[in-house]
């Protein structure tokens, strides 16, 4: 790694993160596109309108995957990962709201909410760091640095 310039390390880190974001979003899109509406959990039923909105959720997650790939091509990080973070945080918040509205009784809802929000927070923190590093490297002198 020492042989790589700071610019190349930033690009490598960005592309690894964007690839992971694209794969994650693509798996979500595939799940929502293929799951039987009768097989969703009660909480997923609330979020997906009893399965009627599964196709819409599949399309939204697919857009997030495409934006991650476009970000790699365009050499920035902001759009795809921001959408992945927003979607994951939204799903986590929805599970937390359902947990509250059902009287704090189903701990699996809380666990699922945490399972969505925690990775969203980690990716958000990484997104802030990578975009700051990109800006610093660009201001320092770009590819030759």
PLM feature segments, named:
Residues 1-26:
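Cytosolic juxtamembrane helix and N-cap/initiation of the first transmembrane helix
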Residues 68-90:
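Loop-to-transmembrane helix junctions at the membrane interface
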Residues 38-50, 70-78:
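Short juxtamembrane and helix-loop transition motifs at transmembrane-helix boundaries
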Residues 117-145:
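Membrane-water interface at the C-terminal end of transmembrane alpha helices
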Residues 61-68, 91-95:
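Hydrophobic, membrane-inserted alpha-helices
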Residues 51-61, 108-120:
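Alpha-helical transmembrane segments of polytopic membrane proteins
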Residues 17, 42-63:
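A loop-to-helix transmembrane entry motif
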């Amino acid at each position: 790694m020492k042989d790589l310039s700071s610019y190349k390390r930033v690009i490598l880190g960005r592309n690894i993160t964007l690839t992971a974001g694209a794969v994650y979003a693509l798996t979500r899109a595939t799940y929502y596109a293929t799951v039987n509406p009768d097989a969703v959990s009660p909480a997923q039923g609330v979020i997906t309108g009893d399965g009627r909105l599964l196709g819409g959720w599949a399309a939204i997650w697919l857009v997030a995957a495409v934006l991650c790939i476009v970000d790699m091509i365009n050499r920035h990080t902001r759009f795809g990962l921001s959408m992945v973070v927003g979607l994951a945080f939204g799903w986590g918040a929805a599970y937390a709201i359902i947990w509250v509205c059902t009287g704090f009784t189903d701990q699996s809802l809380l666990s699922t909410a945490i399972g969505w929000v925690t990775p969203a927070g980690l990716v958000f923190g990484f997104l802030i760091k990578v975009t700051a590093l990109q800006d610093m490297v660009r201001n320092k002198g770009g590819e030759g640095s």
